[in-house]
Amino acid sequence: MGLKADSWIKKMSLEHGMISPFCEKQIGKDVISYGLSSYGYDIRVGSEFMLFDNKNALIDPKNFDPNNTTKIDASKEGFFILPANAFALAHTIEYFKMPKDTLAICLGKSTYARCGIIVNVTPFEPEFEGYITIEISNTTNLPAKVYANEGIAQVVFLQGDEVCEQSYKDRGGKYQGQVGITLPKILK
């Protein structure tokens, strides 16, 4: 399994729509960087956030109650205030169409990590298609700003030595084609 370079990421995005919209260079002046890098792509977080609150005493991933969240639109302010020790969901500006022979792994940006803001995203499986739901945790005891429409994490692409027998699309992945922030789902 090989790590893919900028030239491959660019080709797959421009010719096959792997990342859309696609920024062909790294943008980093006066913003948290995003766009193409040497061996990855820095994704941007949108302006819609879902803050987990304490309306109910329990989060159950098998029976998730959307009333446990508050939707926040940060498009006017340009940022979202994540309270101390809080958790929120967001989504990428970019839409992904993964090739059948490629898996992507997403890692948080050091700019946020050095402020105690941890970003988690599960792997983008072969033939996954959709916007990416991003999990954001503020591990500090202070409120923190998360900037809308700026970089939030970096995606690296690993191409397999052979094509998988069954992709995420083939097995009817429950988050296939997701748009916006997608809450936990259990197939029934």
UniProtKB/Swiss-Prot annotation:
The keyword Nucleus does not apply. It catalyses: dCTP + H2O + H(+) = dUTP + NH4(+). The active site is at E135. Gene3D superfamilies: 2.70.40.10. Pathway: Pyrimidine metabolism; dUMP biosynthesis; dUMP from dCTP (dUTP route): step 1/2. CDD domains: trimeric_dUTPase. Coiled coil: none annotated. Its EC number is 3.5.4.13. DCTP binds at K109, S110, T111, Y112, A113, R114, Q154, Y168, Q178. GO terms for molecular function: dCTP deaminase activity; nucleotide binding. Keywords: Hydrolase, Nucleotide metabolism, Nucleotide-binding. The keyword Nucleotide-binding applies. Pfam families: DCD (PF22769). One of its GO terms (biological process) is dUTP biosynthetic process. Homotrimer. Belongs to the dCTP deaminase family. Catalyzes the deamination of dCTP to dUTP. HAMAP family: dCTP_deaminase. This is dCTP deaminase. The lineage of its organism: Bacteria, Pseudomonadati, Campylobacterota, Epsilonproteobacteria, Campylobacterales.
